[in-house]
């Protein structure tokens, strides 16, 4: 039911359809949906998690919460969290195989491949002078599940690329070490995407503002001894 806001300000109400990535949606966004529902009991939330991006327009979704860049020119986006990517490995792996000294050395190491959407298999990208470069890596283990590849890295199976959100607590505890920490990788900032339109509903605005507030300081950033680079300063774009 569409909220009727005439005659004074009222709490948001009506149907809100939200999409999110499978693992992150289950572990992080779902509890926030629960908290939002307690605050706004007149909003009916349909929350769907998928392993691939969905067509928000065709699927009649109000928004999607995903890491990475804008996938569709028909959408607008608001960044809700900065999130760098790093190369990492366990002390066990580095003790056995050594640590690469240059990006090119990764081609000779055992790398754990996180297969995402239609990305080229085993191609890792990094930034040099504001240009994207690529290197082909190999390894015995790959998966499309982020939690699985992270577990393999913790168990010493190889070098992995993961986001700061996933790595922070393990780097701080010493269970994972950064590899080539001065290498800049494409970021994995967290965005909420929504169909480009002029009249966004009050319930959608309320949920987006709620997310931004909750992600103000979600974790202690990884300390690499240098100022964070490659982070966009804008909090929203369209």
Predicted regions and their residues:
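Flexible hinge/capping segments at coil-to-helix
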Residues: 74-85, 89-114, 129
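C-terminal effector-binding regulatory domain of bacterial HTH transcription factors
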Residues: 42, 164-173, 182-238
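Short, well-ordered beta-strand segments
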Residues: 17-19, 64, 112, 160, ...
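Hydrophobic hinge/microswitch elements
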Residues: 134-178, 184-186
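Ligand-binding cleft/hinge of the Venus flytrap
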Residues: 18, 36, 105, 122-136
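Central regulatory/effector-binding core of bacterial HTH transcription factors
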Residues: 13-73, 224-229
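Alpha-helical linker/hinge and terminal dimerization helices associated
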Residues: 1-9
